[in-house]
Amino acid sequence: MKDINPSHTAAWKALQQHFATMKDVQISDLFAQEPERFSSFSATFNDQMLVDYSKNRITAETLTRLLALAEECGVKEAIAAMFSGEKINRTEDRAVLHVALRNRSNTPINVDDKDVMPDVNAVLVKMKQFCDRVIGGEWKGYTGRIITDIVNIGIGGSDLGPYMVTEALRPYKNHLNMHYVSNVDGTHIAETIKDLDPATTLFLVASKTFTTQETMTNAHSARDWFLKTAGDEQHVARHFAALSTNAKAVAEFGIDTENMFEFWDWVGGRYSLWSAIGLSIALSLGFDNFEKLLSGAHAMDHHFVSTPLDKNLPVLLALIGIWYNNFFGMETEAILPYDQYMHRFAAYFQQGNMESNGKYVDREGHPVSYQTGPIIWGEPGTNGQHSFYQLIHQGTKIVPCDFIAPAISHNPLTDHHAKLLSNFFAQTEALAFGKSREAVEQEFSAAGKSPDQVQHVAPFKVFEGNRPTNSILLREITPYSLGALIALYEHKIFTQGAILNIYTFDQWGVELGKQLANRILPELAQDNPIDAHDSSTNGLINRYKSWRH
């Protein structure tokens, strides 16, 4: 990958000049000038996904200049480097190959001169066999009863992705009840297991090192809870499996290493749902649906690696995001799925984006002079319309939004879906085109109001519009289409990191807090006041000690 400061490129300087002509351009004028703008600024992927980016503050010239930035910063070379197994995560000396996990074409991918695909396929076979046994009832608990409930214990990438996917694909779930525990707050594990039967519960402990503090704390509490009923530690092996590479620690915990599912250091946590970390997905939906999820992602991988940049959906979305964040100063993006099953999608890509591109030094270790990752947030529609859309429509901060919806609902109750989608379509129209003072006054006049009655309230009913959105319309949310959608966002994030000259696949920012927590934990064991920190931290710890009894 090229280490290029994007702000020093000719393309960046050209974009700055172009921005001066675009900063006040109205989306409404762009549509007036080109009534068929939709056909020029939208694309369909595999007849499953329509991506409409026409309601953005861009022209054909904007895209040409943004694409020049991608070319100058070596995006094509960066894509090739990732897919070929090059160690592009240089701070950890690792390849980045979540794409290998869903490489349904089974083409060789080499890391250190070794094809990784035989190992990937072997783990998939092992996962399938395990799923078939548990789902089919062949796997029995220590009393001889079949498994009814599965608890995935993990945190970060070992939790967010599997939880998001099993929720998004809930219509495909089988008879197994899936639960997720992540927080080290004891409430999470306590509330999850309090109504479960130890004899019919299977725990999946997801930790590559088998040392993650939150995960192992919860795993030991789950083990203690299980043994209160089961008694014999030999029974642990019938009720616990591991998603890990630390065979020694897994065995010491009491798990049969035959039920340890490995993954590799070239799998980043927030890109790991495609690996053994996705075992809970496969157990919940069936392995055939897990394979369809992989196939959808692989199809998007193929699009990303083989499509020219000017037609490449992840690249186009990435460039539009950089345009807003770095030239307009729009620092956040909202992800707004109009599908209740997708209620964890924004949270998943909050981690996916912010942990990947929330960096302030470039690949050469220098502080950057430009914006890197945006703040990502969002909630499902229409709930969000009744909470934060007020700010999106009329606030002083412009928030570019991604609206996501399926054309076909899994729950076609009366006219629910038509009402949901009418809101989906209306919101992007309202954000783009707004409502003028003149239109407000005409409405009041038609309602029989006098000019005096209108005068004081009209300013509050004006919508400036010109608020940018992307609309992503799926035919239906299926394992295949969801896989493609997730990969679309993954590759958008990668493209932005490549252009912004940062390391997208490390996360050193999570380390300092963990180090300090490990230092503070022993200080909490005693009741005596401490004075080893700043006055604020000392004060908080000492008040906690005085209040905890």
Swiss-Prot record:
Gene3D superfamilies hit by this protein: 1.10.1390.10, Glucose-6-phosphate isomerase like protein, domain 1
Keyword vocabulary terms for this entry: Cytoplasm, Gluconeogenesis, Glycolysis, Isomerase
Annotated metabolic or biological route of this protein: Carbohydrate biosynthesis; gluconeogenesis; Carbohydrate degradation; glycolysis; D-glyceraldehyde 3-phosphate and glycerone phosphate from D-glucose: step 2/4
Molecular function terms from GO: carbohydrate derivative binding; glucose-6-phosphate isomerase activity; monosaccharide binding
GO CC annotations, alphabetized: cytosol
Record's keyword annotation contains Cytoplasm: yes
Main location: cytoplasm
Cytoplasm recorded as keyword: yes
Subcellular location: Cytoplasm
Any one Gene Ontology BP term: glycolytic process
Annotated catalytic residues: 355, 386, 514
Recorded superkingdom: Bacteria
Known catalytic reactions: alpha-D-glucose 6-phosphate = beta-D-fructose 6-phosphate
EC number(s) reported in the record: 5.3.1.9
Function: Catalyzes the reversible isomerization of glucose-6-phosphate to fructose-6-phosphate.
Family, per entry: Belongs to the GPI family.
Name this protein carries in UniProt: Glucose-6-phosphate isomerase
Gene giving rise to this polypeptide: pgi
